[in-house]
Amino acid sequence: MVLLTGNGPSDKNGKWAFCTGGDQRIRGRAGYQYAEGETSDTVDKAKLGRLHILECQRLIRFMPKIVICLVNGWAAGGGHSLHVVSDLTIASAEHGRFKQTDADVGSFDGGFGSAYLARQVGQKFAREIFFLGDEYSAEDAHRMGMVNRVVPHAELEAEALEWGRKINGKSPTAQRMLKYSFNLIDDGLVGQQLFAGEATRLAYMTDEAAEGRDQFLEKREPDWSPFPWYY
């Protein structure tokens, strides 16, 4: 299980932020350039043209562990999409704020950040969130359906740890299969591949699979008689 949250409060203004998205000061025509001190002559071209937030989304979506977002402050732009793609979201009642700023800066999340958001809150609310770019409280987000629980700020970490205790107290194989089952309907063939890979791994644990391997290595006919068909 993974708990994902932000540092805070800010040394500059005392405010809290979960994640405020991509730094527009280092956004170029080909993506974001994170290497410090680079110039157009020294920059590694292979590092350009990347939107790192998409890699974060894929990691969260495809890892077998359950990811809980602790929204302790602003979740804006790409940060908003991060909480959307996570498995569960717990938000601070006092400081949790949600705002989709993509259209304000000439950007748009045409993947999980928008389409999966619509799965959570419905098409009308999702379009409102993106088209208007308004600010929403933690209670607003909970009412819409994109936040699981709203708790006092001081209890945010304790609540997440309690959720983690419950999650880790259950079958790890069942939990990972559940995550991939939930994802499968939205993830197309990639989702099917992830689910099928886990199913294959489970099959490899059986005596039946061991017999299939052994008969091949031993160059003999297989004996499937101990393994009846289940109906």
Place the predicted regions along the sequence by residue.
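C-terminal long alpha-helix characteristic of the crotonase
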Residues: N13, A91-G96, V147-L194, D207, ...
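Helix-loop "lid/cap" segments that line or gate small-molecule binding pockets
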Residues: I129, S181, I185, E198-Y204
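Glycine- (often His-adjacent) and acidic-residue-rich active-site loop
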Residues: G6-C56, G106
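Glycine-rich phosphate-binding loop at the start of an alpha helix
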Residues: R50, L54, G77, G111, ...
